């Protein structure tokens, strides 16, 4: 009714309705994640504040990620082999410590760590999972990806003709690409005509990690 919504047109009303639905979903997800973390006995004031400040569903997923029950991973296998202290040592980035030399202390036939290289690989697996589970890093990487990454696509088979031919050699900044192009590339990939990737300059990604 016009008296209820004034001069707003149908598109504006749909946007308001969509936003309201999203905010309701956001609050519901916050409550669900808070409950799950509480039940696991892992809730802290920092986690609670992070949930309260979260403005997107992806942020909530990032916050919950470290608490989500994990299947067997390379990092969990490395931890079972006693390599967490080695990972912690590497993270300290002490220039006086030689990681290769330090890794020799973790060799164990019983735990099936047979070489320094294997010990270092396990420690790196632990570090990789730690970084991947860090909500603040994931959020910052997402922002940098939106600002600086390229969406690229190429043909799975360059000789094969298809309606996706214009995307056989395609590259465009993520922040500039139109929605219909993203959908077309997604369809082309699902149908097997395209291979798509999001490319981010390695130096920008590393800068985020080192400035955390």
PLM region descriptions:
Residues 1-8:
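Feature marking long nucleic-acid-engaging regions of large polymerase/nuclease enzymes
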Residues 16-19:
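Short, charge/polar-rich alpha-helical segments
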Residues 12, 22, 26-212:
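Duplex nucleic acid-engaging cores and interfaces of nucleic-acid transaction enzymes
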